[in-house]
C-alpha cells in the first residue's frame, strides 16, 4: 500500500474510533480511568526508581568517573576505619571490603597518577553547628578535597567552588553551600558570598553556592555545605591524627580518566601505587596471603547510599504495580471483547463491502490504542500525584531530607509511552481477533439479537479465561499484601528488652560549640540533674546513640581465654542510671557509679588517637547475657578483664573489667537476634538523652528545650523524638511496603470487581430476551 494511502486510511481509522468513543462516553471514561490508574501507578514507581537507580550523576561526563574500592581475604592492619562514603562496606568477618583509603594514599594518587586528569576525595557527613546566621542550627557538612568540584565538573551557581589552594591547613576557613541550603537557611540572598559564619566555632567565609542540580555523589543524600578536608582538625579534633596516617582509612577517592585512557591501564597503575602504599611504615598493612587489592569501579551513577535502603522495596512495588497493569488489561480486554461480540453485524457489513481482515484488524487496534493513549496521558497526571504521595511518606520516616525525586524526564516519558502501547495491544488483541473471525453469512442473515446470542457462547471461553486471570492476579496481590502486613505486625510485637513507652529522646553535642571532653562530661551531668527535676520525669540518662536507631556500632575484643581470637561485640557508651531509665534488668554485679566515669576518663588518651596514660586503670564495663553465653560459657564474668583486639603497632590499652551483667536488649535491629553487647561509661562525647516521663513525652518537649537553653544557651537540641517514633523510623521500610502493598491490593480488588461487573452486565444484556421468555413461562 502506498504511504499516502496508508496515512489516509489511518487518519480515517482514528476519526472513526474517536466518534465511536464519544458516542460511548460513559464506557470510554471508565475504561480510560481504569487504565490511567494502572499506568499512573507504574509510572509513579518507575519515576522514583529512575531518579535513584538509573540516572547518571549531574556532573560533567560522568562515564569517565571512577571510584576506588578495596577487598581482602582478611582485614588489613588498618587501626582506624570509617564508612563515611555511603558505599557498601564490610570491615568485619571474612572477605572484608570497603571504599575508604588513607589521606597519604590519596595525595600520592592525586600527585602522581598519570591515568587520571584529576583525583578527588571526600568524607562525611559531619554534623556542624552553624552560628552567625540567626539562631544556631545544625547542618550536615561534607569534607571534600580542594579539587572536588573541578574533578566533577560542577560549577557554582553563585560565587566560586572550592579550589586546591583552599585545601591547605594554613588557608583561611571557607565553605560552599548547597543550593537547597542556600535557599532555605539564607533565603537565597546573593549577599551570602563573603559572609562569615561559625562552623563548630570556627569562623568560616562562604565563598560559593553549588549548582542547583548537584547535591552529592550519593543519589538520595543531601549535604548542606562543603568544606575542605584540611579544615577537619579544626572542626572535629578526632580527625587530626588521620591526616598523615597511612593506617587510618577514612576518605573515598574518585578519579576522572584522561581522554583515551582505558580502564585496564588505569587499574594497572593504581595496583602499583596501592602496593607501594601497603609497604609504608614500620609494619606492612597486610600480608601477601591477605590478598588485599584495589579495584576501579564506574562512578557514573554515584555511590550506593540510599540505593541500599530503597532498591528492594522499589523492586517489590514495581512488581506489584505490574500485576495491577495486567489486571487492568484483562479487565479492559474482557469489556472490549464483549463489545466486539455485539458488533459482529457491523464487522460483517464491513467485510461485505470489501474490507479485508487486515483493514478490520487495524481499525480495532486503532480503537484500543486510542484508549491506551488517553489512559497514558491521564496516567502521567496520576503518576505525579502518586509519586508525591510516596515521597511524602518516605520523607516522614527520616529526620533529614531524603533527596529522592519523582521528576518526569525523557526516560519516564518513554516508559509511559511504552507501557501504554503494550497495554493497548494486550487488551486490543482479543476483540481484534474476534472481529477478524466474523462469520459473514450467518451474521448478516440473523438479527443482532441472535448473533449476539451465538457470539455469547463463542465469547464464553476467552471471556471466562480473562475473568479467571483477573481473579487469580487479584488473589496473588492480596496474599502478598497480607504477608507483608503480617511481617510488620510481627516486628512491632517483638520485645526489645526495655520499656519503649513514655521516653523522650534528643541529642546534644557540646563539642560542636567548642567544649573540651572534661567540660562535656560536666555539662552532660548538669543536664541530667536538671532534666530529672522537671515535673512528671521519672528517670533521665544518656548514651552515645539511641537504641534501635539503626546507627550503632561495634568493636572487637580479645579475651584471656581466647588469645589471638577476635571477639565481636556491640558497643554502647552510656551514662549513670541508664538501665533504670530504660527499665532493663541488671542480673548480676552493679550499675555504673560516678567513680567508674572517673576511671574511664583516666584511661582515655589525652591526644585523640594517641596512647592511653601510663598505669591507667581498666575501664569498668557491663555486658549482656548474650556476651556471657558466647564468650564465658555461662560462667560468671564479674571481675574478669579483657582488651581490644590488639594490632601490632597500635598503642596498648589499659583494658576493661566487667562489673555487671544486664538483660539482653535489642541493639540496632528488631529482626536480628541479640548479639554480645558491651556498655561502657560515656566520656567526652555528644550524647542522646533519654527522659522517661509519667505522662505523654511530647508534652515535655518544650520544657526540655527550655532547660537545655537555660543550661547552655548556645547548645542546639538535635533530633528530638520519642523512643516509639525512633522504632517507627527503624521499621519505616517495612511500614511503607506494607501500606503501599495494602493500597495496591485494594486497587487490584476494585479493578477485578469492576471488570467482573462489566462482563456480567454485558452477559445479562445479551440474554434479556431469554430472561423475558423464562419469566413469561
Q: Which residues make up each language-model segment?
A:
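Alpha-helical transmembrane segments of integral membrane proteins
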Residues: 1-28, 299-306, 335-362, 366, ...
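Short, strongly hydrophobic transmembrane alpha-helices
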Residues: 24-52, 56-58, 328-330, 372-376, ...
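A short glycine-centered flexible hinge/capping loop motif at secondary-structure junctions
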Residues: 38-40, 352-356, 375, 379, ...
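Structured, solvent-exposed hinge/loop segments at the ends of secondary-structure elements
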Residues: 42-193, 198-205, 246-250, 263-293, ...
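Hydrophobic alpha-helical transmembrane segments that constitute the membrane-spanning cores
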Residues: 46, 370-391, 478, 751
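"Rare, low-scoring activations can occur
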Residues: 207-218, 233-308, 526-540, 618, ...
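N-terminal membrane-entry
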Residues: 306-323, 410-415, 731-748
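Interfacial "coupling" helices/loops that link adjacent transmembrane helices in transporter permeases
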Residues: 328-372, 755-777
Amino acid at each position: 500500500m502506498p504511504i499516502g494511502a496508508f496515512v489516509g486510511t489511518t487518519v480515517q481509522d482514528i476519526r472513526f474510533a474517536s466518534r465511536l468513543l464519544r458516542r460511548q462516553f460513559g464506557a470510554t471514561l471508565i475504561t480510560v480511568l481504569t487504565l490511567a490508574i494502572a499506568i499512573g501507578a507504574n509510572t509513579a514507581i518507575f519515576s522514583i526508581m529512575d531518579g535513584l537507580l538509573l540516572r547518571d550523576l549531574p556532573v560533567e561526563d560522568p562515564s569517565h568517573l571512577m571510584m576506588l574500592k578495596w577487598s581482602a581475604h582478611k582485614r588489613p592492619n588498618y587501626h582506624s576505619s570509617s564508612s563515611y562514603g555511603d558505599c557498601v562496606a564490610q570491615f568485619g568477618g571474612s572477605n572484608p571490603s570497603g571504599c575508604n583509603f588513607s589521606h597519604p594514599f590519596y595525595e600520592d594518587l592525586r600527585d602522581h597518577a598519570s591515568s587520571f586528569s584529576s583525583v578527588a576525595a571526600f568524607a562525611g557527613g559531619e554534623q556542624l553547628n552553624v552560628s552567625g546566621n540567626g539562631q544556631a542550627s545544625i547542618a550536615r557538612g561534607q569534607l571534600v578535597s580542594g579539587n572536588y568540584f573541578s574533578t566533577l565538573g560542577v560549577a557554582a551557581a553563585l560565587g566560586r567552588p572550592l579550589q586546591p589552594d583552599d585545601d591547605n591547613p594554613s588557608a583561611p576557613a571557607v565553605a560552599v553551600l548547597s543550593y537547597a541550603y542556600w535557599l532555605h537557611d539564607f533565603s537565597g540572598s546573593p549577599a551570602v558570598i563573603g559572609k562569615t559564619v561559625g562552623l563548630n566555632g570556627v569562623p568560616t567565609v562562604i565563598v560559593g553556592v553549588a549548582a542547583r542540580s548537584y547535591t552529592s555523589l550519593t543519589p538520595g543524600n543531601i549535604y548542606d555545605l562543603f568544606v575542605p578536608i584540611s579544615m577537619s582538625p579544626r572542626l572535629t579534633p578526632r580527625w587530626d591524627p588521620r591526616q598523615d596516617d597511612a593506617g587510618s582509612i577514612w576518605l573515598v577517592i574518585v578519579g576522572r580518566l584522561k581522554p583515551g585512557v582505558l580502564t585496564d591501564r588505569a587499574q594497572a597503575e593504581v595496583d602499583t601505587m596501592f602496593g607501594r602504599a601497603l609497604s609504608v611504615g614500620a609494619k606492612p598493612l597486610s600480608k601477601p596471603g591477605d590478598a588485599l587489592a584495589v579495584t576501579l569501579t564506574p562512578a557514573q551513577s554515584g555511590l550506593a547510599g540510599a540505593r541500599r535502603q530503597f532498591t528492594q522495596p522499589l523492586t517489590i512495588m514495581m512488581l506489584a504495580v505490574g500485576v495491577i497493569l495486567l489486571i487492568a488489561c484483562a479487565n479492559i480486554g474482557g469489556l472490549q471483547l464483549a463489545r466486539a461480540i455485539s458488533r459482529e453485524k457491523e464487522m460483517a457489513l464491513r467485510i461485505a463491502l470489501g474490507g479485508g481482515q487486515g483493514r478490520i484488524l487495524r481499525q480495532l487496534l486503532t480503537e484500543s490504542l486510542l484508549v491506551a493513549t488517553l489512559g497514558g496521558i491521564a496516567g502521567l497526571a496520576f503518576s505525579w500525584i502518586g509519586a508525591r504521595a510516596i515521597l511524602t511518606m518516605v520523607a516522614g520516616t527520616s529526620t533529614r531530607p531524603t533527596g529522592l525525586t519523582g521528576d518526569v524526564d525523557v526516560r519516564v516519558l518513554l516508559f509511559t509511552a511504552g507501557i501504554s502501547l503494550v497495554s493497548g495491544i494486550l487488551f486490543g488483541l482479543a476483540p481484534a481477533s474476534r472481529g477478524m473471525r466474523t462469520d459473514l453469512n450467518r451474521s448478516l442473515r440473523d438479527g443482532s439479537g441472535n448473533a449476539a446470542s451465538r457470539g455469547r457462547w463463542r465469547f464464553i471461553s476467552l471471556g471466562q479465561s480473562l475473568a479467571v486471570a483477573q481473579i487469580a492476579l487479584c488473589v496473588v496481590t492480596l496474599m502478598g499484601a497480607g504477608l507483608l502486613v503480617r511481617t510488620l505486625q510481627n516486628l512491632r510485637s517483638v520485645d526489645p528488652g526495655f520499656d519503649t513507652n513514655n521516653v523522650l529522646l534528643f541529642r546534644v553535642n557540646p563539642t560542636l560549640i567548642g567544649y573540651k571532653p572534661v567540660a562535656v562530661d560536666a555539662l552532660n551531668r548538669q543536664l541530667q540533674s536538671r532534666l530529672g527535676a522537671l515535673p512528671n520525669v521519672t528517670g533521665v540518662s544518656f548514651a552515645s546513640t539511641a537504641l534501635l536507631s539503626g546507627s550503632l556500632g561495634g568493636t572487637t575484643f580479645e579475651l584471656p581465654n581466647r588469645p589471638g581470637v577476635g571477639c565481636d561485640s556491640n558497643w554502647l557508651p552510656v551514662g549513670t542510671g541508664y538501665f533504670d531509665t530504660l527499665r532493663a534488668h541488671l542480673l548480676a554485679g552493679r550499675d555504673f557509679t560516678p567513680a567508674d566515669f572517673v576511671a574511664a576518663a583516666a584511661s582515655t588518651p589525652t591526644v585523640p588517637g594517641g596512647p592511653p596514660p601510663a598505669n591507667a586503670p581498666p575501664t569498668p564495663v557491663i555486658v549482656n547475657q548474650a556476651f556471657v553465653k558466647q564468650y564465658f560459657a555461662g560462667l560468671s564474668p564479674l571481675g574478669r578483664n579483657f582488651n581490644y583486639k590488639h594490632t601490632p603497632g597500635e598503642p596498648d590499652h589499659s583494658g576493661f573489667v566487667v562489673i555487671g551483667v544486664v538483660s539482653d536488649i535489642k541493639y540496632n535491629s528488631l529482626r536480628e537476634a541479640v548479639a554480645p553487647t558491651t556498655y561502657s561509661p560515656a566520656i567526652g562525647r555528644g550524647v542522646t538523652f533519654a527522659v522517661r516521663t509519667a505522662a505523654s513525652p511530647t508534652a515535655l518537649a518544650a520544657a526540655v528545650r527550655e532547660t537545655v537553653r537555660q543550661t547552655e544557651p548556645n547548645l542546639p537540641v538535635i533530633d528530638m523524638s520519642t523512643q516509639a517514633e525512633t522504632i517507627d523510623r527503624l521499621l519505616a521500610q517495612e511500614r511503607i511496603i506494607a501500606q503501599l502493598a495494602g493500597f495496591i491490593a485494594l486497587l487490584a480488588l476494585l479493578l477485578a470487581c469492576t471488570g467482573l461487573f462489566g462482563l456480567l452486565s454485558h452477559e445479562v444484556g445479551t440474554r434479556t430476551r431469554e430472561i423475558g421468555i423464562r419469566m413469561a413461562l
